[in-house]
Amino acid sequence: MPAPALTGPQYLREGLKLILSPGLRLFVLLPLSINIVLFCGLIYLAVHQFELWVDTFMPTLPHWLSFLSYILWPLFVALVLLMVFFTFTVVANIIAAPFNGFLSEKVEAVIRGVDESPDFSWAELVAMVPRTLAREARKLGYMLPRMLGLFILSFIPVANIIAAPLWLLFGVWMMAIQYIDYPADNHKLGWNEMLGWLKSKRWQSLSFGGIVYVALLIPVVNLLMMPAAVAAATLFWVRERGADALPIAHARD
């Protein structure tokens, strides 16, 4: 008897439990560690270059402007914090894309009871990189023209009244696409087929996308929510597809 479907919040809660299990933690920690190291390195370089610039620039100013050194540093720190806040999640998604497909595959093995502690394989991960990056490019190709249309709509008098709710609805829909596409891609489901399936499960997809959208808005917490959303989307795939959700080994035959 197939397991019952869940609501969006239930899927995310179960996804969080899955990624915190001992057998899957490594698949979460690795991309997160890479992202943190990358940002720490970039921040270090930015601080070093800014310090050199201040040391070069300040001596050229009149003495009465020396107080600027006490203003420039706080401004720089504020700028760095804003940069991290607005770009960390975006960069994390790009870096994590191959890992997310890999994580989804391992989560599915655990869900199906095939393997409670799947092995990590660099060769398997590297083999997935071209396909997952191509799929990410396909998502951008779907998202950007629609964002442009909404952006233009936002400046049209009267019509712009509906722009805000449409932006929200589109953001929720893109969250469903972003994460449910990982298990769909692992099963070699074509892009249009995947979209068609999500549309056939429109309310379930929007429920899932909505809770993920809200969770990813929370700073720091969103770092854990990204892999949790991958696991939740994989569970969504297995539960909602029912008998059609063949194990990956069969899907690839």
Curated annotation (Swiss-Prot):
Q: Which family does it belong to?
A: Belongs to the CysZ family.
| Predominant place of localization | membrane
Q: Where are the transmembrane segments?
A: 27-47, 71-91, 150-170, 211-231
What is the protein name given in its UniProt record?
Answer: Sulfate transporter CysZ
Annotated Pfam families:
EI24
Q: Where in the cell is it found?
A: Cell inner membrane
- What terms describe the molecular function in GO for this protein? high-affinity sulfate:proton symporter activity
Keyword Zinc, does the record have it?
A: no
Decide whether keyword S-adenosyl-L-methionine is in the record: no
Q: Which InterPro entries match?
A: CysZ_sulfate_transptr (IPR050480), Sulfate_CysZ (IPR022985)
Domain of life according to the entry? Bacteria
